[in-house]
Amino acid sequence: MDRIIKLVETLERPGTAEVLQYLKDSNFKDIHGGASHHKYKGGLIDHSLEVYEAMKKKTEGKGSPSDSVIVCSIFHDLGKTISQSGHYGKSVGILDRCGFELTEDERNAILNHHEVLPEDLNVLAPTNLGTYLKKSDMLSTGQYKFSTGRVKNKSLSKKIFNYLLLAWAKS
């Protein structure tokens, strides 16, 4: 949880203090990542940090603001503190209630990171930020499709995750 807090503390936006307090007061540190991945206490933290590492690696030198990478990766599943289903809308709702200012690209990326869309027609999250969040999330959950097929292991070891991350970042 310390790393999550340190990343969020770097954000210089209205509502940051309120979101930090929400993170500390909520069950964020205790809940699992999802029904089929990171299924252990603290799994959501590990998943969020994996998504952050993947987005950071993929966006280096590509013009995505580093604060947007932090916002999308760390907050995309914030709504799971309320409910596992429909959490993306709840994530944005929590941020709105905290007075945290999201850019339009960040809001769209978080709201649509679970949409199943054709690779060439990412209509709901048309920015690179939305694409990077969706693919980073899929990489962390073991659902990312590579040219050799879909990764099916739902509990990727850190070593395998890092290998896949390097391969994806180079693509």
Write out the residue ranges for each language-model feature.
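Hydrophobic/aromatic-lined pockets within catalytic cores
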Residues: E60, G79, S83, D96-F100, ...
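Divalent-cation-assisted or electrostatically stabilized phosphate/pyrophosphate-binding catalytic cores
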Residues: Q84-R97, N122, L156-K170
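Histidine-centered, transition-metal-coordinating active-site segments
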Residues: M1-P14, A54, T141-G142, K152-S171
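Acidic/His-rich, divalent-metal-binding segments that scaffold phosphate/diphosphate chemistry
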Residues: M1-S83
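Short capping loops/turns at secondary-structure boundaries
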Residues: L44, D67, Q84, Y88, ...
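Histidine/acidic-rich helix-loop-helix segments that form or flank divalent-metal centers
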Residues: E101-K154
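Histidine- and acidic-residue-rich, metal-dependent catalytic cores
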Residues: S48, Y52-M55, S68, H87-L121
